[in-house]
Amino acid sequence: MSAKIIRIATRQSPLALWQANHVREMLVKQWPNLSIELLPMITSGDRFLKDKLLSAGGKGLFVKELEEALLDKRADLAVHSTKDMPAQLPDGLLLTAICKRDNPFDALISPQFKSLAALPKNAIIGTSSLRRQSQLLAYNPNLQIKTLRGNIHTRLSKLESGEYQAIILAAAGLERMGLAHHITQLIPDDIMLPTCAQGALCIECRTDDLEIQELVHGLNDPISALCVHTERRVNAKLGGNCHIPFAVYCTITEEKLLLLRAKVLNMDGSQMIDDEQQGKIAEAEVIADRCTESLMTKGAMSLLSTIPS
């Protein structure tokens, strides 16, 4: 392996820096003589944190500048939360590794109430995710959803100030930051199905950089990668992004079968189309396509057309 310094592009948020350092530590463990530097960057998504992602341009804003750094060779690889990745990558880039998936579920945080079921009528719940909003309202239409933005610490501070009675965050982010003690309830996936690739870190690099691909290959977790790419296939075929209330989650059963579940909702949760497919691991792409076709047959695209663009 070359003696050059490897540069990792990352967002500047505390969670993103933790994730980049985590990947750095795993690489150094495999390649002890490796020299690695972080290249922290402020992305468009970070600048628009106070705005609605719908109007700001969506989840791709959190990776755009990092990908530009890869393409102009200021960075050798980029570390992302895979859930932030658009369905389509720019030409010249690929997801080289999907790290072992952490907790994929959503967490309720509330200083007053012990579960979703305990929330009173008209309780104010903080989230900026249409997926979470629609599933919350499908579970309990009497909840009041209020926009919540900022990094993890900012969101927790807003909860503590009394602005909300509860907030919803990704469990993985809280656990990575040593904040799992704030979790009141891990929300069951029959109430709130995760978003595509939630809980999984990915490493992106240039398609022509075979040296970097070899370097990070050992960080790829085959089962996590299989499940994440299956979810992303459904997401891509439905035109999925953070503009739509869409959830998809793939797991491997005890019987070593691939189980794929997906759902599409309208914004207030009053309408939902869901599907579940199961089959052999080797048929992951077929299962993903079958799930997509089933959702479409049931009217998913018509339902999604009701969502403001």
UniProtKB/Swiss-Prot annotation:
Signal sequence interval, chain numbering: none
GO BP annotations, alphabetical order: protoporphyrinogen IX biosynthetic process
Cofactor note: Binds 1 dipyrromethane group covalently.
Pathway(s) where this gene product acts: Porphyrin-containing compound metabolism; protoporphyrin-IX biosynthesis; coproporphyrinogen-III from 5-aminolevulinate: step 2/4
Any one GO molecular function term: hydroxymethylbilane synthase activity
InterPro entries reported for this sequence: HemC, Porphobilin_deaminase_cofac_BS, Porphobilin_deaminase_N, Porphobilinogen_deaminase_C, Porphobilinogen_deaminase_C_sf
GO CC aspect terms: cytoplasm
Bilayer-crossing regions: none
Keyword tags: Porphyrin biosynthesis, Transferase
Enzyme class: transferase
Taxonomy, superkingdom: Bacteria
Catalytic activities: 4 porphobilinogen + H2O = hydroxymethylbilane + 4 NH4(+)
UniProt cofactor(s): dipyrromethane
Modified residues (S-(dipyrrolylmethanemethyl)cysteine): 242
EC number: 2.5.1.61
Family: Belongs to the HMBS family.
Miscellaneous remark of the record: The porphobilinogen subunits are added to the dipyrromethane group.
Subunit comment: Monomer.
Annotated function: Tetrapolymerization of the monopyrrole PBG into the hydroxymethylbilane pre-uroporphyrinogen in several discrete steps.
Protein name: Porphobilinogen deaminase
